[in-house]
Amino acid sequence: MIRVAINGYGRIGRSILRALYESGKRQQMQIVAINELAKPEAIIHLTQYDTTHGRFAHKVKLVDDHMLIGDDAIKILHEPDPTKLPWHEMDIDIVYEATGVLLDRQSCEAHIHAGAKQVLISHPSSADVDGTIVYGVNHDLLRAEHTVVSNASCTTNCIVPVIDVLDRHFGVKSGAITTIHSAMNDQQVIDAYHDDLRRTRAAGQSIIPVDTKLARGIERILPHMKDKFEAISVRVPTINVTAIDLSVTLEKTVDIATVNHVLESAANGRFNGILGYTDEPLVSCDFNHDPRSSIVDGTQTRVSAGQLVKLLLWCDNEWGFANRMLDTSLAMIAAKRG
């Protein structure tokens, strides 16, 4: 049994725990510890009840310093210094680093020094980690010696499989991306101070442009795409699910039917369970709690002059990403154990 700890129990940390139980992967992995500075009562409550994803199917109880889920007892820790975490004593195989704060090798190696064998970061990281993985595209690069790995971002996981498919079939010359992302907890409920002046404004009242490094994230996964993409991002007043407007110029001449056929075939084949395809007239909330990284909306595919293709992609930026955290961590463990 793989022994897991979660460091940082916010939106992604809680989604990882719930996804573990809902996906059936609990038979392979067990969460034995959560390190979170919040009060235990709040930890239990937000595990049981969630505005976005609904009630957790399992009853959650607090007994002493443990969260009980059925027969599973998960130790709740409140340690701000990761070097002092009891990972050696708890025989932790892998830590999900989900604070959004520890984003480079040196800071994440605190978990290794504390006794964990591997760390998977739930965020884009600095370039000095052992690898940045988009599961389904490059997880085969994982090696036994890799100890600190990034799971990239939700939007990178959404867009890279699609770019990979298009490039393999038609060749991608260049592209431009607009991410239409649900509001996040680094924004304000009502106007308040923030270093980013746009993020001083109420999240529920505006479409808010924010910085994004998505184009650079694509390059890290697909190095041959260096300097071929640029991206912008806006936050919109919804609490979950993200849309990506992707425009690419292809080397080959195509039509809408050809593009959609190739993407649907990939969704049913190599990327089954990771990439999806729909031709139904759906809206963003229809993709809430969808475990896939990306869903192509075939009704919105457009082709101009044979080589300029516009696509609309959907993803649950919480749930899909949490499921890829599970997949990537299992691949890391498999690589380590040979």
Swiss-Prot record:
GO cellular component, as recorded: cytoplasm
Binding residues annotated for NAD(+), in chain numbering: R11, I12, N317
One GO BP: pyridoxine biosynthetic process
GO MF entries: erythrose-4-phosphate dehydrogenase activity; NAD binding; NADP binding
Superkingdom of the source species: Bacteria
SUPFAM superfamilies noted in UniProt: Glyceraldehyde-3-phosphate dehydrogenase-like, C-terminal domain, NAD(P)-binding Rossmann-fold domains
Pathway the protein contributes to: Cofactor biosynthesis; pyridoxine 5'-phosphate biosynthesis; pyridoxine 5'-phosphate from D-erythrose 4-phosphate: step 1/5
Documented EC number(s): 1.2.1.72
InterPro entries: E4P_DH_bac (IPR006422), GlycerAld/Erythrose_P_DH (IPR020831), GlycerAld_3-P_DH_AS (IPR020830), GlycerAld_3-P_DH_cat (IPR020829), GlycerAld_3-P_DH_NAD(P)-bd (IPR020828), Glyceraldehyde-3-P_DH_1 (IPR006424), NAD(P)-bd_dom_sf (IPR036291)
UniProt enzyme class: oxidoreductase
Catalytic activity: D-erythrose 4-phosphate + NAD(+) + H2O = 4-phospho-D-erythronate + NADH + 2 H(+)
Site-annotated residues for Activates thiol group during catalysis: H181
Keywords: Cytoplasm, NAD, Oxidoreductase, Pyridoxine biosynthesis
Annotated compartments: Cytoplasm
Residues involved in substrate binding: S153, C154, T155, R199, T212, K213, R235
Pfam families tied to this protein: Gp_dh_C, Gp_dh_N
CDD domains the record matches: GAPDH_C_E4PDH (cd23937), GAPDH_N_E4PDH (cd17892)
Quaternary structure and partners: Homotetramer.
Function: Catalyzes the NAD-dependent conversion of D-erythrose 4-phosphate to 4-phosphoerythronate.
PANTHER family assigned: GLYCERALDEHYDE-3-PHOSPHATE DEHYDROGENASE 2 (PTHR43148)
Family: Belongs to the glyceraldehyde-3-phosphate dehydrogenase family. Epd subfamily.
The protein, known as: D-erythrose-4-phosphate dehydrogenase
Organism: Shewanella baltica (strain OS223)
